[in-house]
Amino acid sequence: MGAIPKNRRVVYHHTMRYVLILMTAPLWAQTMDQLELHQVAASKVQYEGKDAVRLLARPNVANGESYAILKGERFHNGTIEASVAGKPGANAAPDARGFIGIAFRLQGNRYEYIYLRPTNGRADDQVRRNHSVQYGAHPAYDFDRLRRESPEKYESYVDLQPGVWTQYKIVIEGTKARLYVNGAVQPCLIVNDLKLGDSQGGVALWVGPGTEGYFADLKITP
């Protein structure tokens, strides 16, 4: 192998191959040691044809407390992409929705996040469908507060199925974020006033209470 350009980094793939990338972070090249776990159990698995990381939220964990931080990742503006699949776990409560998404700009216990409710995507209740996608800012701005103070502003509909791979992409610039699902040209959720402002911080894989979540194909582009 020749000289490696300074603006690139090499990660060691778990199948004993070297992968050369430009400013990205492929999830399946991460080891469990590179994930800082918060109230989740994590494992490497094969799921629906993909090398993936599975996260299981710990029982009786408060909303917003279960995630896995990518160690050493510092994010400000850019794009975060992943394949995600979420579904209620075996012992989940009846109101579990398979909550799954990405948290960004983590600073201590504060972060922004956009997540999916896969069981809502094809529900027979239109109100539930309208709540398929959600933005929040932990810990002060959870879904309940945002729904009370600004109904329908921070959530929307998108077609989802529990346990099925969904292409997830968020584009973040300053105090704005856009979520694109399954290669759509138009965003399914637009947030023009990120509650933590034009900040920067870490990135985490996020699951909500009762979720069995899978993550693959992660790419972070500044």
Protein language model annotation of sequence segments:
Residues 141-167:
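Short, aromatic/His-centered strand-loop micro-motif at the edge of beta-sheets
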Residues 18-27:
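Sec-dependent N-terminal signal peptides
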Residues 66-73, 102, 154-160, 203-205:
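Beta-strand-rich interaction surfaces with strong enrichment in secreted/lumenal proteins
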Residues 160-190:
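Carbohydrate-binding surfaces in secreted/extracellular proteins
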Residues 189-216:
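Flexible glycan-contacting loops in extracellular carbohydrate-active proteins
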Residues 46-62:
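Short carbohydrate-recognition loop motifs
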Residues 67-140:
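Secretory/extracellular carbohydrate-interaction modules
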